[in-house]
Amino acid sequence: MHESFSYMSRTLVTEPFHDKKLLESIWGKTWGITNPVGKVKQILMHRPGSEVNRLEKYSAQIESGPMLLNQIKGNFSINSMPQSPDLERLQQQHDALADALRKEGAEIIYLEDHENAWPEMMFTRDLGMVVPGGVILSRFALYIRYGETRLAAQKISEAGMPILGMVQGMGFAEGGSFTMLDPQTAVVGTSERVNAAGVDQIRQILSFQGIRLIAVDLPASIIHLDEAFLMVDQQKALVNISLLPFWFIDELHSRDIELLHVDPRDPVLTINGIAASPGRVICASGGSYTIDLLSKNGVEVIPVDISEIVKMGGGIHCCTLPLERKG
């Protein structure tokens, strides 16, 4: 007899929605994430197709460069690349990333809808904020990505994962700027892609589980938190202190989190990796100095070539949305 039949009673429900036993019995799994480094179980990805050819030549400006910077005169660096990606190489590198995740025990769920694919759908991280018990779907700030949420809702529902909410109204929020820090704490970075109304909606949904949300103001030069902060072990984080406020650095110190600074000699998106399990990280192979730093500090690194992927304006973290982690 299926375990859910044990709940066939007219007794009032006394457990909260996120009760692990209830989730596993009714929804098939505990779903969601309580911490950012637990062993990956399921990850949502999208293998890039011909949709990427719809982008303009300087496509990286759309994803990694804040649109606000287009209104500022003068010389400054933005995270763009001077050429469009080669689709065949892009697919090969994406496949290699997926293979690396499978070797770490992850099941890949593909978001495939090439007929209706949006140009930047490869960056599945932005589709939602995965929290204990389910996902909060994003509302994108740019029209070029706006339709991705509908496709994500369909695929995530098909997988059987609870959708706990969706950013609505005039709120905007994207998953690349969100992470669970521990079972009681989450962090969101505010930028032109994540506004106060979006943060308020995330905070309200998290409050049902008693989870505190820390909102970090990001500089105008970046759009997502994952360009500046990545947990790599239970008590270790890779950071770019030039992109984070002092009080957040102090908050991490107060939690006894050891901070490792991404090497400025490495490519910009070196920090944009993913923890496959505690102390084991998949990282861009081009970030040799940072890889050396991580290795010397007890973090195992699985290098993957993303030289073509970054031409789209994103990295490894951007291409992966874990739906379930251990712990």
Region locations from a protein language model:
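The feature marks the mature, well-folded catalytic cores of soluble enzymes
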Residues: 1-327
